UniProtKB/Swiss-Prot annotation:
Compositional bias (Basic and acidic residues): 572-586, 664-682
Keyword annotations of the record: Coiled coil, Nucleus, Repeat, WD repeat
Species for this entry: Danio rerio
Compositional bias per record (Acidic residues), positions renumbered to this chain: 523-534
Subcellular location: Nucleus, Nucleolus
Sequence ranges of Polar residues compositional bias: 587-600
A Pfam family: NOL10_2nd
Descriptive protein name: Nucleolar protein 10
């Protein structure tokens, strides 16, 4: 038996353990059972609860006494009696079974749908009748009031076979190309069929007409689902009279209320595998949905996960035993799994001893230890020289390493390192000595990085003498021991630069907060020491003191800013002096090279101007080179001197930069030339105010522009004579 806990829900796998092969004789099986301890300790709840190769589907009779399973190879059906906990009978079939159903309360009436379109009926004694449907079938449902079997498959029709009359009835015509699953509501007998296009068609068996259609493919696409391709319906299950769960081929489950066309909840398995089975657990309001990889149990109202089961083999079918916490799975494996979940319900009455067994296991939990095997990684194998054994039966791959026999491991370890025991003994002695040293009185050692911060934290920790306050301020005391902040006192990259501008501007605020905290601690100690209450009006004094503290740290911030500006001026002055000295040196060097060249042969030298630059003179070359080589800080300082840049510091350490764009020399020259031109025109302009005539008053000879006084020959715009 294997015990696992998923989401704090205990799950017992009763089929876990070694199984004996079928080809062994009974005598050899008995011998193995006597010799092998693991086989003796295993729990075989139902004898021979397995198939030769694969189990495809599994069902429980209505009375709960019989468990029937269909599988291969060869195709067969097996019936197990729970009262006897053993196999009751086995019947071989002609072809593989797609699905089957139990029509009676016990095993006396069975219907099998085969992959070759045959429908086979079995009675209590065995095979009873066999017929064939027109198309390949995928699922069927039994309508008990009319004794009709509804078959769906690779066709747009729903075939009806009446078991009372023994003949086929008129089929139900649908718009779908193919249909995958079907189900009948146990309360009002509504028939529902899931189509290949992702639609669910609902029919009323009384009138044989479609009453509703649900588009599940479109509803399965939400923000929380991962849908790849067109979803088709792969599972259907009714719950009571109004509940319906639909499973899609892309791994989504849609929970519907039949009164609405929109799903109440959309749940995604996130595996992208078709949903194969759906079951409702009404006592806990759970839905059990299964694909080929996992069985998930979740709340039908909010989708919250209750637990999950992930068998080792792929799942073909799931059957929930009624009114209990037991379920069976048909797998791609000879063994059929039996799971018991006490949180879902009690054990069935035919195996009530499971409740006592699980209670004993919970009282005495045991950890799983592999005493006979040693887990080694690939690096360990290389150090032992056993890398060549990878892939051999001596190593069993598991996760990121391998399991090997513990005896082989000890032998190889002794051969590789014969002095391993001596080293182990020395390590143990060293550990004992270190433990004894830890009990001595130890001096506080400061870390290599941020010593002042560590010293400050230690001082604050020593000031907290009261135990209650020490609990409240436990963060400051344990900061040096906390692994999250351990790097801050070991890595030099985290060293606090106290000479930086940001630290000097923020330090007054931090020191003020620390001072306030220290004062508050002292006041609390005084309050606890005093027996009488303090007089009224203390709040105003605290406010006054806080205002004075605020004024104090504001003045300190201003003083720090003033000191920073003075230091900046001094640095800029020193840099200017250094640049002047460099300029003098470069001029002397250029003059020396000029004299050396004058004594030598005079040869012409050619210079190539770079593209995008304007050549003015050779004297600007050195200045340009200095400008290009200068750092960003030096360029900003030059701009600040020329009044085109202003740099201000705020109280919290940030900077404010304001700059103005200068006009180019060419633009200034053009503007100055225009101003000179206008001034010159103004100076040479002659006034014509002294030139006037008494005839007319206009611009011409008359009073206007012409000879008259108007614009022509008459009086016009000019002034008339008085």
């Amino acid at each position: 038996m294997q015990v696992s806990s998923v989401n704090n829900v205990k799950i017992y796998n009763l089929s876990h353990g070694k199984s004996l092969p079928e080809w062994l004789s009974d005598r050899k099986k008995r011998v193995l059972q006597k010799k092998d301890v693991d086989i003796q300790r295993r729990i075989e709840l139902i004898q021979d609860f397995e198939m030769p190769t694969v189990c495809t589907s599994i069902r429980v009779s209505r009375d709960g006494q019989y468990i029937l399973a269909a599988g291969t190879y060869k195709p067969r059906v097996r019936c197990y009696d729970t009262y006897q906990l053993s196999l009751k009978f086995e019947r071989c079939l002609d072809s593989d079974v797609v699905t089957f159903d139990i029509l009676s309360d016990d095993y006396s009436k069975l219907v099998f749908l085969h992959i070759d379109r045959y429908v086979e009926f079995h009675s209590q004694h065995g095979h009873y009748y066999k017929t064939r449907i027109p198309k390949f079938g995928r699922d069927f449902s039994y309508h008990s009031p009319s004794c009709d079997l509804y078959f769906v498959g690779a066709s747009s029709e729903v075939f009806r076979l009446n078991l009372e009359q023994g003949r086929f009835l008129n089929s139900l015509q649908t718009d779908a190309a193919e249909m995958n699953v079907c189900d009948i509501n146990p309360v009002h007998q509504l028939f529902a069929a899931g189509t290949l296009e992702g639609r669910v068609d609902c029919w009323d068996p009384r009138v044989r007409t479609r009453v509703a259609a649900l588009d599940c493919a479109l509803s399965s696409i939400t923000d929380n689902t991962e849908v790849e391709g067109l979803p088709s319906v792969s599972a259907l299950k009714f719950n009571d009279s109004l509940g319906l769960a639909v499973g899609t081929s892309t791994g989504q489950i849609l929970v519907y209320d039949l009164r609405s066309s929109r799903p109440l909840l959309v749940k995604d398995h996130y595996y992208g595998l078709p949903i194969k089975s759906l079951h409702f657990h009404n006592s806990l309001d759970l839905v059990l949905s299964a694909d080929s990889k996992i069985i998930k149990m979740w709340n039908k109202d909010n989708g919250k996960v209750f637990s999950s089961i992930e068998p080792q083999a792929n799942i073909n079918d799931v059957c929930l035993y009624p009114a209990s916490g037991m379920l069976f799975t048909a797998n791609e494996d000879p063994k059929m799994n039996t799971f018991y979940i006490p949180a879902l319900g009690p054990a069935p009455r035919w195996c009530s001893f499971l409740d006592n067994l699980t209670e004993e296991l919970e009282e005495n939990p045991e950890s799983t230890i592999y005493d006979d095997y040693k887990f080694v990684t690939r690096k360990d194998l290389e150090s032992l020289g056993l890398a060549h054994l990878i892939g051999s039966p001596l190593l069993r791959a598991y996760m990121h390493g391998f399991f090997m026999d513990i005896r082989l491991y000890h032998k190889v370890k002794t051969m590789v390192n014969p002095f391993a025991y001596e080293e182990y003994r020395k390590d143990k002695i060293r550990q004992k000595i270190e433990e004894s040293r830890a009990q001595r009185v130890q001096l506080k050692k400061l870390p290599k990085v941020n010593k002042e911060l560590a010293l400050k934290l230690m001082e604050e920790d020593t000031e907290l003498t009261n135990k209650k306050k020490k609990k409240k301020a436990n963060v400051a005391g344990n900061l040096l021991m906390d692994d999250r902040f351990k790097v801050m006192f070991e890595n030099p990259d985290y060293q606090v630069d106290e000479r930086s501008e940001e630290f000097r501007l923020l330090n007054p605020i931090i020191s003020n907060v620390a001072e306030r905290r220290r004062k508050s601690l002292l006041e609390e100690e005084q309050e606890q020491a005093e027996e009488e209450q303090e007089p009224e009006g203390r709040g105003s004094s605290e406010d006054d003191s806080s205002d004075e503290d605020d004024k104090g740290w504001v003045q300190e911030v201003r003083e720090q800013r003033r000191l920073l500006r003075m230091e900046e001026r001094e640095r800029s002055y020193i840099q200017r002096q250094e640049r002047r000295q460099q300029d003098r040196n470069t001029r002397l060097q250029s003059s020396d090279t000029h004299t050396q060249q004058s004594h030598g042969a005079q040869k012409p030298r050619f210079y190539q101007i770079k593209s995008g630059e304007e050549f003015r003179s050779f004297s600007d070359v050195s200045r340009k080179q200095k400008t290009h080589k200068a750092s960003l800080e030096e360029r900003l300082q030059r701009l600040e001197k020329s009044d085109t840049l202003s740099l201000n510091d705020t109280a919290v350490g940030s900077k404010q930069l304001t700059f103005t764009l200068k006009k180019t020399e060419k633009q200034r020259f053009q503007q100055q030339a225009e101003r000179d031109h206008h001034e010159e025109r103004r100076r040479i302009r002659r006034s014509a105010g002294h030139l006037h005539s008494n005839r007319g008053g206009g611009r011409g000879r008359g009073g206007g522009r012409g000879r008259g006084g108007g614009r022509g020959r008459g009086g016009g715009r000019g002034r008339r004579p008085f």
